[in-house]
Each structure stands twice: as C-alpha cells, then as structure tokens.
Amino acid sequence: MQNITQSWFVQGMIKATTDAWLKGWDERNGGNLTLRLDDADIAPYHDNFHQQPRYIPLSQPMPLLANTPFIVTGSGKFFRNVQLDPAANLGIVKVDSDGAGYHILWGLTNEAVPTSELPAHFLSHCERIKATNGKDRVIMHCHATNLIALTYVLENDTAVFTRQLWEGSTECLVVFPDGVGILPWMVPGTDEIGQATAQEMQKHSLVLWPFHGVFGSGPTLDETFGLIDTAEKSAQVLVKVYSMGGMKQTISREELIALGKRFGVTPLASALAL
C-alpha cells in the first residue's frame, strides 16, 4: 500500500505551510491553503481513505467543482503543526456530483473540518478556473505582515496599491501585471467575503483583505507562494522607505511600460495611468 503522506501533494502542502509559518505569515491558526487535484492524483491512495467518509454540505452549490478533489488545511489548525501530523491538520475532500457538498476522504482526524474560509476558497477556485482556463489550482490565504501594514497607510484602492507595489520592487510588475484587488473590511469566514473575494479574483491573482491578510492564486504551490512572497517583499521595502521619509526617486511610468514590453506582460491600465 502506498502511503499518502509521501505523495507529492501532501509533501507540497507540508512545505508550503511550513515555509509560510517560518515567514511569520501564519500565527496560531491563521491562514489557509487549498490545492485542486485530479482523480488520477489520489487514485493510488484509495487504501488510505476513511472507510466511511463524512459528508458536509456546502452553504451554496458549486456545480463547477462537481466531482473535484482538493487537499485543504483544517479549521483551527496551526500551520506550524502540519509537518508534525499531516493527517490531523490536512484533509482530502471531494465535491459530490452536483456540487452541493463534499466527502472527507482522508485526514482531518478527530472530527476536524476544513478551513472556515472554504467558501472563499471554493468560490475563488471557480473564478480562477474560468479566468485561467483551468490553469490555476491553488488558493492561499495568509497574514503577510507588511502587506497588512500598508493597508493602514495607503489608500485602499486597487490602482494606488498596485502602483506602489510595482514601484517597491522591479519584479512586481512582471509577477503580477494584473495588479492587486482590494476589498473593504469584511467579517471573515462568511459567504459574503467569499463572494467579494471571488469577484476580485475574476481580474486579479492577488486580493487584499485590509487589516487582515491576502489571498493569492496560481497554478502550483510554488508559484502561489512566490506570488505572495514577491508582493510581501515589495511591501517590506515600502514600509522601510516610508519610515525613512518617503521616496525621493522611483520607477517612472515610462520605465514600467518598458518593463512590461520586455517581459511580454500587459500592466493594469488604471495603475499605469497614475
């Protein structure tokens, strides 16, 4: 029998959650991570599955995700502990045939359940599937320190925030040319914030929750982690720059345009126009 804890997807989740903890992005039970899988990924591990998988209904049907398996972090679970006990802190779930709920196939032992932000994740997965023609498979939410800090001092506007991050580090425009979506402050763990996040995910691979954290989407765990890491590095630079009295020089609009042309990306027009 193959051990599912040695699978690429469990090992990938262990690495991503451990790296996020070491970055300081996921204190206590902060943060959540979901990865969309294929049936072929989990097929070799059926012997590891629960004999009687628990069924949990979704608060709203998501037919686009019907029959789709995911590996997810658990509600109330600490990222720092995933590496110590993957089966207690992670779970493999599979949405049923009509998208009305899901079965917990593996993990989430002792009656644990998936992250409370699962509505936001699933709704965002739906939008990123459509926006990227199925390429994006990962949704990651974390409490990236400097990005949160900037939501207190910058105008919480997509164009303004995006332009500042682009200027904070040259690679940012290349990594997220579609910019950063921003929500108003909302109560977490609700369908409302999930729907608002998904709406922004139609246009952006990064979405900020002011005074709370960030959502990122990408095709792989590495790409998604790297996306957030890049934005957070720029935010860290900006926090230092603002603390030293502000910018005396920066990357110009013309230089940003040249950067986009060199790397074949189309920068968000509203941010470029500022």
Swiss-Prot record:
Binding site for Zn(2+): 141, 143, 212
Effect recorded for residue 29 to A: Severe loss of enzymatic activity
Classification via SMART domains: Aldolase_II
Subcellular location: Cytoplasm
Database matches in InterPro entries: Aldolase_class_II_sugar_metab, Aldolase_II/adducin_N, Aldolase_II/adducin_N_sf, Rhamnulose-1-P_Aldolase
Induction remark: Induced by L-rhamnose via the RhaR-RhaS regulatory cascade. Binding of the cAMP receptor protein (CRP) is required for full expression.
Cellular component terms per the entry's GO annotation: cytosol
GO annotation terms (biological process): pentose catabolic process; rhamnose catabolic process
Pathway(s) per entry: Carbohydrate degradation; L-rhamnose degradation; glycerone phosphate from L-rhamnose: step 3/3
Main location: cytoplasm
Keyword match Metal-binding: yes
One GO molecular-function entry: metal ion binding
Positions in coiled-coil regions: none
Cofactor, free-text remark: Binds 1 zinc ion per subunit.
Reactions this protein catalyses: L-rhamnulose 1-phosphate = (S)-lactaldehyde + dihydroxyacetone phosphate
Pfam families per UniProt: Aldolase_II (PF00596)
Cofactor(s) listed: Zn(2+)
Active site residues per record: 117
Catalytic activity, EC: 4.1.2.19
Keywords associated with the record: Cytoplasm, Lyase, Metal-binding, Rhamnose metabolism, Zinc
Family classification: Belongs to the aldolase class II family. RhaD subfamily.
Quaternary state and interactors: Homotetramer.
Function: Catalyzes the reversible cleavage of L-rhamnulose-1-phosphate to dihydroxyacetone phosphate (DHAP) and L-lactaldehyde. Also catalyzes the dephosphorylation of phospho-serine in vitro.
Name of the protein this chain belongs to: Rhamnulose-1-phosphate aldolase
Species per Swiss-Prot/TrEMBL record: Escherichia coli (strain K12)
Lineage: Bacteria, Pseudomonadati, Pseudomonadota, Gammaproteobacteria, Enterobacterales
